[in-house]
Amino acid sequence: MIELGVNIDHVATLRQARRTYEPDPVWAAVEAHLGGADGITVHLREDRRHIQDHDVRRLRELVHIKLNLEMAATDEMVEIACALKPEMAMLVPEGREEITTESGLDVAGKEARLKSVVAKLADAGIMSSVFIDALPEQVDAAARIGAKVCEIHTGPYAHAFHAKGRDRESAAVVAEIAKIRDAGAAVRALGMRFNAGHALNYFNVQPVASLPGVGELHIGHAIVSRSLFVGLREAVRQMKALIREAAVPFD
């Protein structure tokens, strides 16, 4: 069964808007877990725009659920990850001016550095994941650096889905799904785990969840947005139900 990792960054975004102490991301993680989340994802950015260092420490100490730490491949973040020991560390690109992660990590262009980072994380007992675009050269590079997981960037698919009025049969949407499917097959053929995420929501998640071999989906903004109206626990339950309905078994 496909797992759901719930990204709670935007709970912290709301808190940081007032530089106060609520809403508490740790409480959000507990609610997500009670709603059926299989893991919690947080992105500790270099600029600390939402999740803070104390958030990740408290999550590690207080929430008994798999933790996925999104991070840039910097010395500071590697040191934090090795001390924190999340179950998984996902290497992502970062830009100071971006609103959210805009593209996949260029693993092929930074192999030497990323191979060193992956080795350090492995020495600390941390599984390494890379967030990449659905490109063959990036999948191949991920395998060469020793990554255990590839999260395929679903943003281009999500944008096409929205632009085409949520028409799953439109040529643009079908083409983007095919790219994700083919990248996922390549990931699995190279012995890595195939995850997917970015800009997935309640309307577009099922075509991705139905792809063969998807192990885990990471979804945040859509779930946090819906939680304003139905509560976080129920928002997670609804997403899990959609994934379960669409998922196909795989070996």
Regions found by a protein language model. Name each.
Residues V6, A32, H43, A81, ...:
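Conserved, mostly hydrophobic/aromatic
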Residues D75-L84, L135-I145, A196, L200-V214:
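Catalytic cores of alpha/beta
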Residues M1-L4, E61-L69, V117-V130, A183-A196:
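Short beta-strand/loop segments at the ligand-binding rim of alpha/beta enzyme cores
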